[in-house]
């Protein structure tokens, strides 16, 4: 009769044995420190994806991450819009940080982590549920005949949810459809609880732990052929009755009995010796032969020896009978030891093929009762049989053994003499190294005795050959023969320590493996779900949901606290100045700053988990630092603007209406248009503020505070590139407008004068042009030049081209960079001093540079030359009204900074600035400036002078004077009223014309004649003629080559060797 014996007398080890009479055929041992992890369900997080392995590594709570192959990933973890074309790519399926529910398919072995799967399987008494694998399912392969047909009909009547698979176990044979449906409903309830628990906590943690050894034994081994279940512990007996009832096997409750005999349970049935055989390498056979089982990293090798076997009439019969016995014992040992993987059996050689087939059939019949899947091949011509067995759990040796600290698992150690000679060679090798003072050898006692006695002369020879090197050999009784340490001590590192104290000194370097780490037992992790106490109501999740209502009102409360009404007086004056100046023009939107920021912050916090927002946040952070870096320059610019703003009294009545409109627009504006709206607002704000009149000095401090408040509440939006906020307004004006310039009026200000350091003093000579568009300010040119310099001298691109159109553009850009270099290969200073350049033998080729860039560089040089220590800012009262007039075809005076002689005792350098830069472009045709042209310019100025009408009586507009080309540089220049300046400049131009007969001015172009460097007159050297003549070649010979033309021949007849007598 078959029995199940459960030994629980020792709490450190629980053993379950299945016996048939007194023959042990299955064994399961579990220790508290070696619980089985296979079939445990975890919630893990993907930490790394390896496309080369087509797998992902998952952190599920263990020290070593699990291995999740691509084929073990369920379809439910694929992206919603994923469409597989051929072989799927794991990077398209999974992403790092994704949380998955995994089950351990193979436990950790050696250096390999656990193999995981997302196809969960929940094993019950009669059924195995595959909740996310619809392709899996069927009936156990052991069930055959009519039982299989009945189970198919029962399966058809079960209510299985869509997308799930079901397997009927062997224990389900003969069960009714109601019993199968009850087990199925239990598994479905279990799966729902697993999903609920997975949603309650973040990964990684253990959701479901596989049952202990008793429950597994009841679930896997309880069959109708089990006659009784004997347990030697009353507490375990009560626990077993509960498990039987929970598993739905009430028919076995009567078979559970308590063993109360004096003899231990396993000894009573004489299976202790059989259990011990499962831990031994060699197992004896009844006939006298033996089998030897060796487990390696790759496979398990089993060798069969006849040994003392004498059964049989001849050697062939003896080999055949021994192999038959070995086949039965091998099948039994595989179950007892739970060996899995590849197994190779070396049977005793058998000549007849029928004997080989008989042994194969005996082995197949012996493993039929094994739960694991087994595949067996035929015996090869070398007498080897290959088979594979499913690894259900760690083998008996892996769960109860550890690697030997002495032999490191090899089973052998090196001989003392061989090890001593190896240490001696290593000592000499260390002594040969440079800067070696001592060599310390810490060795076991037998090795030290051999080196200090038998090999004393060899040690002395090493010290003699290596002058100054001292060999110290120290015996250590804590060491065993395979281990030793040879340490090299450099000069200056030696310590005055006694030799027998060296092992303690080098204790860290030796670091012998301790056995304490094997004795450590980790505290088992508690699962989130109880195994058998399955509640009808899923477990309540962790208190994460109540936090949602607290977070939700946060974005709604943000817009309710506008930042604009904080200082109504400042904003009213600011809006009043803008409204009064433009009189109902385009409305400004400075109060949009606080509203978008109040809404953007909660929005960005909500999008923290979106991976596509990471780059945008990075750009915002970079922009924050850039704005802080340029805060000082922005404040200075704002101060200059605010001084030019006029205080208006009529704006206070419009404050409430504008505030309501701006707030409404800010709330209803789309978030996608926030960056564009911010950029347009800044450009409009800069243009308008550039035209504002100067504010009174009593409100200057308040304006500075308002500017700082505006900078603080300005929303941070991603921009392509930070732009300089000094853009000027461009207008088209007629000849009369540009020619009219009011006289310069110096105003005395009661307050302390403000000294500006940035711009240098500039003077402008007004020209009479055709109707043209005004030139931009030097600041704008510098900005454009800076942008061009950033882009390698080329215009900045507004956007990035599509990826599929980018290759040819890159090729053109590379060709352009190579064809037109931005730097000269030879420095200009060296070229000017070179006589070869002056004589025309060497030419430097430069890239095409716009004339505007050349003029800007010349202006910079002029500004550097004319910098003076004292600079006084004098506002110029001049108002210009647009006048539309017909084109006037007159010559245009070039903008020239010339010395102006003033008969005053103390000349001063006066800087005049104007927000509108009026610099007329010259005509395209180069023309010569004459006196008549200057007179015409004066007449036009006089005729256009009465047209001037000031827009506002209190408006003080400063004139920005632009410099162009330096003719004569003087240390001091004073700006005078417009009309006299024109006349004096004309005279100056006459004097210049006396030196240079013709001065041509081209459109946006500046030239200068080439100045020859002082060098002696170049006289080319006459070519040299040589008198050498090629000698005539006289050929002597027959005019042919080869053996047939030879004149001398030598030959030798073949000689026969002399015979040896």
Curated annotation (Swiss-Prot):
Gene Ontology CC entries for this record: bacterial degradosome; cytoplasm; cytoplasmic side of plasma membrane; endoribonuclease complex; membrane
Keyword field contains Lyase: no
Keywords: Cell inner membrane, Cell membrane, Cytoplasm, Endonuclease, Hydrolase, Magnesium, Membrane, Metal-binding, Nuclease, RNA-binding, rRNA processing, rRNA-binding, tRNA processing, tRNA-binding, Zinc
EC number: 3.1.26.12
Regulation: The presence of a 5'-monophosphate on substrate RNA accelerates its cleavage by catalytically activating the enzyme. Binding to the membrane stabilizes protein structure and increases affinity for the substrate.
Compositional bias per record (Pro residues), positions renumbered to this chain: 536-546
Residue span of region Disordered: 532-565, 586-731, 752-822, 1031-1061
Region called Interaction with RNA, residue ranges: 57-112
Resulting phenotype, residue 66 to S: Disrupts folding of the S1 motif
Extra remark: In K12 strains that are derived from W1485 (including MG1655 and W3110) the rph gene has a frameshift that leads to loss of its ribonuclease PH activity. In strain K12 / MG1655(Seq)* the wild-type Rph protein has been restored.
Domain notes: The N-terminal S1 motif binds RNA, and can also bind single-stranded DNA (in vitro). The C-terminal region interacts with the other degradosomal components.
Protein name in UniProt: Ribonuclease E
Organism for this UniProt entry: Escherichia coli (strain K12)
């Amino acid at each position: 009769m078959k029995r199940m014996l459960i030994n629980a007398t020792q709490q450190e080890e629980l053993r379950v044995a299945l016996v048939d009479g007194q023959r042990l055929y299955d064994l399961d041992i579990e220790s508290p420190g070696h619980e089985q992890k296979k079939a445990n369900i975890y919630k893990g997080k993907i930490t790394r994806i390896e496309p080369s392995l087509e797998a992902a590594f998952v952190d599920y709570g263990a020290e070593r991450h699990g291995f999740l192959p691509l084929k073990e990933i369920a379809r439910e973890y694929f992206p919603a819009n994923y469409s597989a074309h051929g072989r799927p790519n794991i990077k398209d399926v999974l992403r790092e940080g994704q949380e998955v529910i995994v089950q351990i398919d193979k436990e950790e072995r050696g250096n390999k982590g656990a193999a995981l799967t997302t196809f969960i399987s929940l094993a019950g008494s009669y059924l195995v549920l595959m909740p996310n694998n619809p392709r899996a399912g069927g009936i156990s392969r052991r069930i055959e005949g009519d039982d299989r047909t009945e189970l198919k009909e029962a399966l058809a009547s079960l209510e299985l949810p869509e997308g799930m698979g079901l397997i009927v176990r062997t224990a389900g044979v003969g069960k009714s459809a109601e019993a199968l449906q009850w087990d199925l409903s239990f598994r479905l309830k279990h799966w729902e609880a697993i999903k609920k628990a997975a949603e309650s906590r973040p990964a990684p943690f253990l959701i479901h732990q596989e049952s202990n050894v008793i429950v597994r034994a009841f679930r896997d081994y309880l069959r109708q052929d089990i006659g009784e279940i004997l347990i030697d512990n009353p507490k375990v007996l009560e626990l077993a009755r509960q498990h039987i009832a929970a598993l739905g096997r009430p028919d076995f409750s009567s078979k559970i009995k308590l063993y109360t005999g004096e003899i231990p349970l396993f000894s009573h049935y004489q299976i202790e010796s059989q259990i011990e055989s499962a831990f031994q390498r060699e197992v004896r056979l009844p006939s006298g032969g033996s089998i030897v089982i060796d487990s390696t990293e790759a496979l398990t090798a089993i060798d069969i020896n006849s040994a003392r076997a004498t059964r049989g009439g001849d050697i062939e019969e003896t080999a055949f009978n021994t192999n038959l016995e070995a086949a039965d014992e091998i099948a039994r040992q595989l179950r007892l030891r739970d060996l899995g993987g590849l197994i190779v059996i070396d049977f005793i050689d058998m000549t007849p093929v029928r004997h080989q087939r008989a042994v194969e059939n005996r082995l197949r019949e012996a493993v039929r009762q094994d739960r694991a899947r087994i595949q067996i091949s035929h015996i090869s011509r070398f007498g080897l049989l290959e088979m594979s067995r499913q690894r259900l759990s760690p083998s008996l040796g892996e769960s109860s053994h550890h690697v030997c600290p002495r032999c490191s698992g090899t089973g052998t150690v090196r001989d003392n003499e061989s090890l001593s000679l190896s240490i001696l060679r290593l000592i000499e090798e260390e002594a040969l190294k440079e800067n070696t003072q001592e060599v310390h050898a810490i060795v076991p006692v037998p090795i030290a005795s051999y080196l200090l006695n038998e090999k004393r002369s060899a040690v002395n020879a090493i010290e003699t050959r290596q002058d100054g090197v001292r060999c110290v050999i120290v015996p250590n009784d804590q060491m065993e023969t395979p281990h030793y340490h040879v340490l090299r001590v450099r000069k200056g590192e030696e310590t005055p320590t006694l030799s027998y104290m060296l092992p303690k000194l080098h204790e860290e370097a030796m670091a012998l493996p301790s056995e304490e780490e094997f004795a450590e037992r980790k505290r088992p992790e508690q699962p989130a779900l109880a195994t058998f106490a399955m509640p009808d109501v899923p477990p309540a999740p962790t208190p994460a949901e109540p936090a949602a209502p607290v977070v939700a009102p946060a974005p709604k409360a943000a817009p309710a606290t506008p930042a604009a009404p904080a200082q109504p007086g400042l904003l009213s004056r600011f809006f009043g100045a803008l409204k009064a100046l433009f009189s109902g023009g385009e409305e400004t939107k400075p109060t949009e700053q606080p509203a978008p920021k109040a809404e953007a912050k909660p929005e960005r916090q909500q999008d923290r988990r979106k991976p596509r927002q990471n780059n945008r946040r990075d750009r915002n952070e970079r922009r924050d630092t850039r704005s802080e870096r340029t805060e000082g320059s922005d404040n200075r610019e704002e101060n200059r603007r605010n001084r030019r703003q006029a205080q208006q009294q009529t704006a206070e009545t419009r404050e409430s209406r504008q505030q309501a409109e701006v707030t409404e627009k800010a709330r209803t504006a789309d978030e996608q248009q926030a960056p564009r709206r911010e950029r347009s607002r800044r450009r409009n704000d800069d243009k308008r503020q550039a035209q504002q009149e100067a504010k009174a000095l009593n409100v200057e401090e308040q304006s500075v505070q308002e500017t700082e408040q505006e900078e603080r509440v300005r929303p941070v939006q991603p921009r392509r590139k930070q732009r300089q906020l000094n853009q000027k307004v461009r207008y088209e004006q007629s000849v009369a407008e540009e020619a009219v310039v009011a006289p310069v009026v110096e105003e005395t200000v009661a307050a302390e004068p403000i000294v500006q350091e940035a711009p240098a003093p500039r003077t402008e000579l007004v020209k009479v042009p055709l109707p043209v568009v005004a030139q931009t300010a030097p600041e704008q040119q510098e900005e454009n030049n800076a942008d061009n310099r950033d882009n390698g001298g080329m215009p900045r691109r507004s956007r990035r081209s599509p990826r599929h159109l980018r290759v040819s553009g890159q090729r053109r850009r590379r060709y352009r960079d190579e064809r037109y270099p931005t730097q000269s290969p030879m420095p200009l200073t060296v070229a000017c001093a070179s006589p070869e350049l002056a004589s025309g033998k060497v030419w430097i080729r430069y890239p095409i540079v716009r004339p505007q860039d050349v003029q800007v560089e010349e202006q910079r040089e002029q500004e550097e030359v004319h910098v003076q220590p004292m600079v006084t800012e004098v506002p110029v009262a001049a108002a210009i009204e647009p006048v539309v007039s017909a084109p006037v075809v007159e010559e245009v005076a070039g903008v020239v900074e010339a010395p102006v002689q003033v008969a005053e005792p103390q000349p001063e350098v006066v800087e005049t600035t104007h927000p509108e830069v009026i610099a007329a472009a010259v005509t395209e045709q180069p023309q010569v400036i004459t006196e008549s042209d200057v007179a015409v310019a004066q007449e036009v100025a006089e005729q256009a002078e009465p047209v001037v009408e000031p827009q506002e009586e209190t408006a003080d507009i400063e004139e920005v004077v632009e410099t162009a080309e330096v003719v004569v540089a003087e240390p001091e220049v004073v700006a005078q009223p417009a009309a006299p300046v024109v006349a004096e400049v004309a005279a100056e131009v006459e004097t210049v014309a006396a030196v240079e007969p013709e001065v041509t001015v081209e459109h946006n172009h500046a030239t200068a004649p080439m100045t020859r460097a002082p060098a002696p007159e170049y006289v080319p050297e006459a070519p040299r003629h040589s008198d050498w003549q090629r000698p005539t070649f006289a050929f002597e010979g027959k005019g042919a080559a080869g053996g047939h033309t030879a004149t001398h021949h030598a030959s030798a007849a073949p000689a026969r060797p002399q015979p040896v007598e």
